[in-house]
Each structure stands twice: as C-alpha cells, then as structure tokens.
Amino acid sequence: ILKKDNYSYISFYNALIHEGYKDLAALLHSGIPVISSSNGGKDSVGGITS
C-alpha cells in the first residue's frame, strides 16, 4: 500500500488516526508526502499541518 501513490499513504495514515492507532500513525507522520494544493501553500493531512 505504501508504494502505490501519495494518496494511498495519506489514506492509510488517516485510517490509523481514525481507528485510534496514534502511536503507529506517529511513526508514519514524518514520511507523509507533500501534495501541492490551492490552500495558500500550506499542506495539511487530516487536519494536521506539516
């Protein structure tokens, strides 16, 4: 799953957060891919700004 694409990685991370696996999600947080968006240059994932 982690080799598919950036959105798969982010989706997996968000699922860990949602299901209460914050300790495991914390291990993945540093590897979250940066995805450009039109939100003023700030990238966020699941409400977390990197």
Swiss-Prot record:
The keyword Cytoplasm does not apply. It comes from the Eukaryota. Residues 1-31 form the CARD domain. Residues 46-50 form the NB-ARC domain. Keywords: Apoptosis, ATP-binding, Calcium, Nucleotide-binding. Transmembrane segments: none annotated. GO terms for biological process: apoptotic process. GO terms for molecular function: ATP binding. Physiological concentrations of calcium ions negatively affect the assembly of apoptosome by inhibiting nucleotide exchange in the monomeric form. Monomer. Oligomerizes to a heptameric ring, known as the apoptosome, upon binding of cytochrome c and dATP. Oligomeric Apaf-1 and pro-caspase-9 bind to each other via their respective NH2-terminal CARD domains and consecutively mature caspase-9 is released from the complex. Interacts with APIP. Interacts (via CARD and NACHT domains) with NAIP/BIRC1 (via NACHT domain). Interacts with CIAO2A. The CARD domain mediates interaction with APIP. The monomeric form is autoinhibited in a closed conformation through a bound ADP at the nucleotide binding site. Exchange of ADP for ATP and binding of cytochrome c trigger a large conformational change where the first WD repeat region swings out, allowing the NB-ARC domain to rotate and expose the contact areas for oligomerization. Oligomeric Apaf-1 mediates the cytochrome c-dependent autocatalytic activation of pro-caspase 9 (Apaf-3), leading to the activation of caspase-3 and apoptosis. This activation requires ATP. This is Apoptotic protease-activating factor 1. It comes from Canis lupus familiaris.
